[in-house]
Amino acid sequence: MSAPARSARLGVLALAMINVASIVSARNLPVMAEYGWSMLALFALSILVFLVPISMAAAELGTAFPREGGVYAWVKEAFGGRTGFLAVWCDYAENVAWFPTVLSFIAASLAYAIDPSLATDKTYLVVVMLVFFWGTTAAALGGVRASSVIGSVGTIAGSILPALLVVGLGAAFLLRGDASQIPFSAGALVPDVQLDDLAFLGGIILLFTGMEMAGFHARDTRDPGRTVPRAIALAVAVTVTFSVLGSLFMAFVLPQHEISLVSGTMELFSSVLHTFSADWLVAPLALVVAIGGIAHLTPWILGPATGVSVVAREGLAPARLGRTNRNGVPVALLVVQGLAGSVFALLFVVVPSVSTSYWMLSAVTAQVIVAMYALVFASVIRLRYTRPDVPRPYRIPGGLPGVWLVGGVGLLGCLSSFLLGFVPPSQLATGNTAVYVLLLALASVVLSLPPFAFALLERRRGRAVAATAPS
């Protein structure tokens, strides 16, 4: 989505809401709801090892290097164009696996407006996913302006509204006096530390991706040193509140062993509305959520692809990837994205469980995106050495030890998330462990490989040109 005009300077609240709009969603709440009360300890751990470090790193980089390009510009400044391209490619590639998770949420929500049993029908899910995926891809060909208008409406109806409803209906359920599905006890707060029980923790990063958005808009504020850190702090508070309350209320209402990772949000709506004898509201609400989800998806179809096309025009990728239509849309990248996303969507047909398919795609998404975040943490450390004289309106406190602590903890969080993604979760039937791990590893490698392949081809082309040049 396009940045605001330079004359429209952003304040703390406006900048914070940009972050909140890009992060808050009810779609990923079922993952943490599976943990019951122990989710509180896991949330605290994730906030400490990822959310706080990435927020601080984005605040420093965004205010020190407030230029267009975001993560690409930061990583390029630290490690050069090739590594910067790897970072922006990871942002593009992770969307290929992420799109089917959003589309499955949309399809499952729409099922509650037609027939709730369709939410577990694989054929229905895949057909609806592909129709909406290519439909939104076609809409994205209209350019950034069209995508931004659609996305503004979709962000509210597709992400923020469902999250608000999860919290509101969950609270209404408890205030009515209904019994919680997870009775409180001190022991329930302690998570099981078996690896297969902690596997979902690898995907919690998806609840917090996007916190770097405030850093992207640092140049659109009057006083980045004050505005960006405060906006990030406010966005963190709002995001954590929604995520924790939403996950808790879902766990209160739905039995843990019955929570679907795909349709858990609509299951909560249906269950609570039934207790209030308001079942008639389920279908129209499902329709609003589904339409909002489609609208929310549209700008994301275009955004990362546009970033890759800009880098391609700088000569760091094949020139054809940088070609655009009259609306400035990189058609080739959208087609490749559509074909690859469609292949990933077919996982819902191959894997026995809908929830397992959803989780595998979420795990691949997390594994690819943590590579980008790891580069951000490495960049904030390296730039303290290579560009120490650049003014930093916001500086991670503690000097070099402080930036090493924040960056080091963030890198550790990224590594942990990456490795946990390969562990089959005990909450799901994943089949043969070796096949599960192999599929995830293969998907992650295939999605991350192109930048290295492009670099190798360019190196060989350079050698060929040098060999044929007259001496």
Q: Predicted regions: what is each one?
A:
Residues G168, V364-M372, L400-S471:
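A generic transmembrane alpha-helix motif of multi-pass inner-membrane proteins
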Residues L40-A41, L118-Y124, V153-A286:
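Helix-loop-helix junctions that connect adjacent transmembrane segments
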Residues M1-A5, A73-K76, L103-V127, L161, ...:
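Helix-loop-helix connectors at the membrane interface of multi-pass transporters/channels
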Residues R6, I150-V153, A157, R320-N327, ...:
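C-terminal membrane-solvent junction of multi-pass transporters and transport-like membrane proteins
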Residues A73-W74, G80, Y112-S117, A231-T298, ...:
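TM-loop-TM module centered on a large, flexible mid-protein loop between adjacent transmembrane helices
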Residues Y124-R176, I232-A237, S362-L375, G402-V409, ...:
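Membrane-interface loop-to-helix entry segments
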